[in-house]
């Protein structure tokens, strides 16, 4: 199994994938490289992609009213972010900035929907995991 495929299977929404489903999903994803200090997306940008970190670290933050940054999280390999935008495209609620050079896998809504249609058993698990994550943030 490739490192990227292993990272996909460890991402919270995709833990139930078997090797074949993980390989199929990985084939639907795009590789993204970002250099230290670069902004992947900014708070308020439109979004419809989730990202899984393969290598490196990113930080998620928001801007306060007085212009200061509120750090939400530092994320590393195997962690995922942006998943809500797959089902509710709209403005991003935070800014994602590379803390180190990083390699990511990106999955857009336009590729996820057909993949789920081909893997309906995974779709139910995905919805259950998404509901779990939402309950953790009290939405």
Q: Residue ranges of each PLM-predicted region?
A:
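Cytosolic regulatory regions built on CNB/CRP/Popeye-like sensor folds
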Residues: 1-139
């Amino acid at each position: 199994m490739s490192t990227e495929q292993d990272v996909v299977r460890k991402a919270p929404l995709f833990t139930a994938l078997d090797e074949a489903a993980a390989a199929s999903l990985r084939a639907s994803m795009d590789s993204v490289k970002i250099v230290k200090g670069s902004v992947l997306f900014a708070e308020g940008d439109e979004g419809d992609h989730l990202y899984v970190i393969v290598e490196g670290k990113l930080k998620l933050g928001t801007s306060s009213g007085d212009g200061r940054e509120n750090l939400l999280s530092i994320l590393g390999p195997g962690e995922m972010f942006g998943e809500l935008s797959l089902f509710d495209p709209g403005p991003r609620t935070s800014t994602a900035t590379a803390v180190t050079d990083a390699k990511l896998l990106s999955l857009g809504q336009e590729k996820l929907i057909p993949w789920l249609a081909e893997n309906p058993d995974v779709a139910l698990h995905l919805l259950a995991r998404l509901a779990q994550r939402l309950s953790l943030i009290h939405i």
